[in-house]
Amino acid sequence: MTPQAFYLVLEQAGFALTNHQKEQFDTYFKLLVDWNRKINLTAITEENEVYLKHFYDSVAPLLQGYIPNEPLRLLDIGAGAGFPSIPMKIMFPKLDVTIIDSLNKRIHFLQLLAKELGLEGVHFYHGRAEDFGQDKQFRGQFDLVTARAVARMQILSELTIPFLKIKGKLIALKAQAADQELEEAKKALQLLFAKVLDHQPYQLPNGDGRYITLVEKKKETPNKYPRKAGIPNKKPL
């Protein structure tokens, strides 16, 4: 997917980008490739692939109508090189974006990226989701939590739901096996007082299959969740 094809698909979906936004995506691509030589950010570095499998894939929830262009607080867990939240922020500048990532080198990249792109209302924190999920500054503070290819839903739900306000939503982007994951996660979602609202398959423009799963928080998360760092992974709910 060339940059021009990316812009055209967005325009056809009703999201025409300004020249400034196009420049931001171009700068993002160049910085991603440059920094990837120093630290491992992505296995995908060819321009057309980045625009398809990183940029388009990241903004798919916007194109599907799951996120409005409003000043909502969005948390991205394990964003790596900034996906999906930074492409979302470029398209919807009103979003207030927070990223938590466990690798400090990636946080340094994201700080530089935000500065080069001229982004405001972006915040980066180094650490584990399990620790931040028990911090009053973060727990129950977000309208939206996004996660792309972070963990199976059974684990992911414990890492993300505690951050949401009541009626806040988790938007999980999955490449495959999403139906099976949801079946496995039934108990976890019950324990966390969360409910699946939507679970939609869609395709990238090249035909690759993807899923978006939308989960709503119904009540306050019990205090014992999330458990200590590493436990959700070793002993899923």
Swiss-Prot record:
Task: Kindly state which keywords UniProt assigns to this record, in alphabetical order.
Answer: Cytoplasm, Methyltransferase, rRNA processing, S-adenosyl-L-methionine, Transferase
User: What Gene3D superfamilies does the record tag this protein with?
Assistant: Vaccinia Virus protein VP39 (3.40.50.150)
Question: Which EC number(s) are documented for this chain?
Answer: 2.1.1.-
InterPro entries in UniProt = rRNA_ssu_MeTfrase_G, SAM-dependent_MTases_sf
What domain of life is recorded for the organism? Bacteria
What does the record give under GO molecular function?
Answer: rRNA (guanine-N7-)-methyltransferase activity
The subcellular location is: Cytoplasm
A cellular component term, taken from the record's GO annotations: cytosol
CDD domains reported for this sequence: AdoMet_MTases (cd02440)
Q: What is its main location?
A: cytoplasm
Q: List the disulfide bonds.
A: none
Look up the signal peptide feature and give its range: none
Q: Which residues bind S-adenosyl-L-methionine?
A: G78, F83, A129, E130, R148
Give the HAMAP family listed for this entry: 16SrRNA_methyltr_G
Function in brief: Specifically methylates the N7 position of a guanine in 16S rRNA.
In which family does this protein belong, per the annotation?
Answer: Belongs to the methyltransferase superfamily. RNA methyltransferase RsmG family.
The record ties this protein, via NCBIfam families, to:
rsmG_gidB
Q: Tell me what this protein is called.
A: Ribosomal RNA small subunit methyltransferase G
What species does this protein belong to? Streptococcus equi subsp. equi (strain 4047)
UniProt gene name: rsmG
